[in-house]
Amino acid sequence: MNDRMVWIDCEMTGLSLADDALIEVAALVTDSELNVLGEGVDIVIRPPDAALETMPEVVRQMHTASGLLDELAGGTTLADAEEQVLAYVREHVKEPGKAPLCGNSVGTDRGFLARDMRELEGYLHYRIVDVSSVKELARRWYPRAYFNSPAKNGNHRALADIRDSITELRYYREAVFVPQPGPDSERAKEIAARLSAPAAP
């Protein structure tokens, strides 16, 4: 089994789809074992001046500290960024609509992709693999694993944040998930039957 997974992270001037702009997009493709395929892409996008003027101060400070703000003047267009990301994704994912979007809290990223990079967003499966969901469950069910998870080093730069997300999922797979190959078929059927049985009156 070698199902592809498309990891995308975006940096924006804020979280509002009505007012804010994409300023960086990065992508890595992995196989089902979380091995990275190729070099990936990381592209800085020059936003409209209006989006820069209305950027919240906390976001401005974050992008200043990461160095991203200084790179925006030399950034490319949305169309060019989408073309570069799609070229990389298509190199490793041959069929559209097959590979899920993966990352941390990727619902927000998907919203901006659907607004600004429709062809790229449409190339992905409608399902997502959100590492933050795994993390939230681990916090509730396996707190020791949650509190000892790897430190993040991405510093709010898109490609580094993706690498952090992949590392996180590798960690939770080893620390929390049932070891491969998992339960045999009989045990799996037994669990399913027990959990789906009607509750006693």
From Swiss-Prot:
This is Oligoribonuclease. The lineage of its organism: Bacteria, Bacillati, Actinomycetota, Actinomycetes, Kitasatosporales. Residues 5-169 form the Exonuclease domain. One of its GO terms (cellular component) is cytoplasm. It comes from the Bacteria. InterPro entries: Exonuclease_RNaseT/DNA_pol3 (IPR013520), Oligoribonuclease (IPR022894), RNaseH-like_sf (IPR012337), RNaseH_sf (IPR036397). HAMAP family: Oligoribonuclease. Belongs to the oligoribonuclease family. Gene3D superfamilies: Ribonuclease H-like superfamily/Ribonuclease H. The gene is orn. Pfam families: RNase_T. SMART domains: EXOIII. It comes from Streptomyces griseus. The keyword Cytoplasm applies. Its EC number is 3.1.15.-. Disulfide bonds: none annotated. Keywords: Cytoplasm, Exonuclease, Hydrolase, Nuclease. The active site is at residue 126. 3'-to-5' exoribonuclease specific for small oligoribonucleotides. GO terms for molecular function: 3'-5'-RNA exonuclease activity; nucleic acid binding. It is found in: Cytoplasm.
